[in-house]
């Protein structure tokens, strides 16, 4: 988590008494937190914060509108209904892995099913053994994100990390 923070790909939830970042790694993320973590892990946090609301959902808190809008516009997330995102619902491992597979260029329906992304995630190398498929705390989201940095984009030899370097999210030396 600290390494992702150094790359501005993961921020945490606050500051502890000792001044260190509170990543709250033992708690399961909500769907809106999972999407926020995903967008930041793609180096698009600043862009998302500036993005106007474009999603159709009525249950997204104002602070997250840009993140959900970015992810929705990019086809990385969908709602739980036409106007419901399920913002405060607990994000499952299948949800986060699906978000990350979409970010790597894979399409649910064509390449995998959203509720069972495990086989493709294993093939892509984004599912470390430590990830608990049934109980998915923020620590597991960090593990999937770290693994995804080394995963190749669909139909490309470029890894997600290389894509982020090419976009200027961080330098090769910082990585």
Residue ranges and their predicted role:
Residues 1-2, 6-65, 73-135, 149-175:
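Feature responds to low-complexity, polar/acidic, surface-exposed segments characteristic
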Residues 145-146:
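Flexible glycine-rich surface loops and low-complexity tracts that mediate binding to linear polymers
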């Amino acid at each position: 988590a600290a390494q992702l923070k150094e790359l501005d790909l993961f921020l945490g939830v606050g500051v502890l008494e000792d001044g260190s970042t509170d990543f709250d790694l033992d708690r399961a993320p909500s769907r809106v937190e999972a999407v926020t973590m995903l967008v930041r892990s793609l180096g698009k946090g600043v862009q998302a914060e500036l993005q106007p609301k474009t999603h159709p959902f009525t249950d997204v808190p104002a602070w997250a509108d840009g993140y959900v809008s970015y992810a929705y516009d990019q086809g990385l997330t969908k709602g739980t209904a036409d106007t419901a995102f399920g913002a405060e619902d607990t994000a499952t491992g299948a949800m986060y892995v699906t978000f990350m597979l979409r970010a790597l260029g894979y399409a649910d329906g064509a390449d995998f099913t959203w509720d069972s992304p495990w086989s493709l995630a294993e093939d892509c190398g984004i599912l470390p053994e430590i990830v608990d498929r049934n109980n998915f705390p923020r620590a597991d989201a960090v593990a999937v994100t770290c693994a995804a940095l080394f995963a190749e984009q669909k139909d490309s030899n470029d890894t997600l990390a290389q894509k982020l370097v090419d976009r200027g999210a961080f330098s090769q030396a910082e990585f």
